[in-house]
Amino acid sequence: MAKKPTLDFETTLKELEEIVNRLETGDLPLEEALNEFETAVKLVQQGQERLQKAEQRIQILLQKNEHADLTDYP
Protein backbone atom coordinates (compact mmCIF):
# COMPACT_ATOMS: atom_id res chain seq x y z
CA MET A 1 0.00 0.00 0.00
CA ALA A 2 1.37 3.41 -0.95
CA LYS A 3 2.08 5.79 1.89
CA LYS A 4 0.05 9.01 1.87
CA PRO A 5 2.29 12.03 1.20
CA THR A 6 3.16 14.13 4.21
CA LEU A 7 1.15 17.34 4.43
CA ASP A 8 2.63 20.67 5.43
CA PHE A 9 1.94 21.76 8.99
CA GLU A 10 -0.80 24.25 8.14
CA THR A 11 -2.68 21.75 5.98
CA THR A 12 -2.35 19.11 8.69
CA LEU A 13 -3.77 21.51 11.26
CA LYS A 14 -6.66 22.50 9.01
CA GLU A 15 -7.53 18.87 8.31
CA LEU A 16 -7.43 18.12 12.05
CA GLU A 17 -9.81 21.00 12.74
CA GLU A 18 -12.20 19.69 10.10
CA ILE A 19 -12.13 16.19 11.61
CA VAL A 20 -12.77 17.57 15.10
CA ASN A 21 -15.74 19.54 13.79
CA ARG A 22 -17.20 16.43 12.15
CA LEU A 23 -16.67 14.37 15.30
CA GLU A 24 -18.19 17.04 17.54
CA THR A 25 -21.46 16.99 15.62
CA GLY A 26 -22.11 13.49 16.93
CA ASP A 27 -23.85 12.63 13.65
CA LEU A 28 -21.27 10.16 12.33
CA PRO A 29 -21.90 6.43 12.49
CA LEU A 30 -19.57 4.66 14.91
CA GLU A 31 -17.32 3.09 12.26
CA GLU A 32 -16.92 6.38 10.41
CA ALA A 33 -16.17 8.20 13.67
CA LEU A 34 -13.49 5.61 14.49
CA ASN A 35 -11.94 6.04 11.05
CA GLU A 36 -11.92 9.81 11.48
CA PHE A 37 -10.34 9.45 14.92
CA GLU A 38 -7.66 7.14 13.51
CA THR A 39 -6.88 9.67 10.79
CA ALA A 40 -6.71 12.44 13.41
CA VAL A 41 -4.21 10.47 15.51
CA LYS A 42 -1.96 10.04 12.46
CA LEU A 43 -2.24 13.74 11.64
CA VAL A 44 -1.32 14.68 15.21
CA GLN A 45 1.77 12.48 14.97
CA GLN A 46 2.75 14.13 11.69
CA GLY A 47 2.25 17.56 13.19
CA GLN A 48 4.33 16.71 16.25
CA GLU A 49 7.15 15.41 14.05
CA ARG A 50 7.12 18.61 12.01
CA LEU A 51 7.19 20.75 15.16
CA GLN A 52 10.08 18.73 16.58
CA LYS A 53 12.06 19.15 13.36
CA ALA A 54 11.36 22.88 13.35
CA GLU A 55 12.49 23.14 16.97
CA GLN A 56 15.70 21.27 16.14
CA ARG A 57 16.39 23.63 13.24
CA ILE A 58 15.86 26.63 15.52
CA GLN A 59 18.23 25.19 18.13
CA ILE A 60 20.90 24.60 15.47
CA LEU A 61 20.54 28.14 14.17
CA LEU A 62 20.73 29.58 17.67
CA GLN A 63 23.84 27.55 18.45
CA LYS A 64 25.53 28.69 15.25
CA ASN A 65 24.82 32.31 16.09
CA GLU A 66 25.55 32.01 19.80
CA HIS A 67 29.09 33.32 19.46
CA ALA A 68 28.53 35.69 16.57
CA ASP A 69 29.33 39.33 17.21
CA LEU A 70 26.37 41.66 17.18
CA THR A 71 26.76 44.58 14.83
CA ASP A 72 24.70 47.70 14.38
CA TYR A 73 23.00 48.13 11.06
CA PRO A 74 23.10 51.60 9.52
From Swiss-Prot:
Its EC number is 3.1.11.6. It is an enzyme of class 3 (hydrolase). One of its GO terms (biological process) is DNA catabolic process. InterPro entries: Exonuc_VII_S, Exonuc_VII_ssu_sf. SUPFAM superfamilies: XseB-like. It catalyses: Exonucleolytic cleavage in either 5'- to 3'- or 3'- to 5'-direction to yield nucleoside 5'-phosphates. GO terms for molecular function: exodeoxyribonuclease VII activity. The keyword Zinc does not apply. Keywords: Cytoplasm, Exonuclease, Hydrolase, Nuclease. Disulfide bonds: none annotated. It holds the Pfam family Exonuc_VII_S. Transmembrane segments: none annotated. GO terms for cellular component: cytosol; exodeoxyribonuclease VII complex. It is found in: Cytoplasm. Belongs to the XseB family. Bidirectionally degrades single-stranded DNA into large acid-insoluble oligonucleotides, which are then degraded further into small acid-soluble oligonucleotides. Heterooligomer composed of large and small subunits. This is Exodeoxyribonuclease 7 small subunit. It comes from Glaesserella parasuis serovar 5 (strain SH0165) (Haemophilus parasuis). The gene is xseB.
